[in-house]
Amino acid sequence: MIDQSRAYQYAKWCTQRGNRKVGKYVKLQAKKWLRIADGRRKDAYVSEKAYRKICKLLKLMIHPDLHCSMYDGLEDYAWFLIAAVFCTRRREDDRRFYQTAILEIARKNFKTFNSAVIFILGMLTEPCL
């Protein structure tokens, strides 16, 4: 299921040879995440259960500008960020593999909007301590 996701497709696109539309560090991170998603890392995996949960939640949320579900309205890079942060788990204790996420894009490119979506998903999915 994850290999048909927009996050996976975006990561594949980022790592294509000769792709100059993404930065060096985005390519490196996409390569690392693809290794995890393909099951080639012993310490981490992409949880299908967590991915399905995120998809269901995004289908319930309405995009304010596009008037469609967030599932359909999010950009591919946002899908990649969300899938990597919320669906990538450690094998040893099933906790999130990535504890910190950095989104560095130019101004006026939905950073605050994507941060709000991530914040809402975090409130709905992360356990209370």
Where are these regions (language model features)?
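Phosphate/NTP-binding elements of NTP-utilizing enzymes
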Residues: 1-129
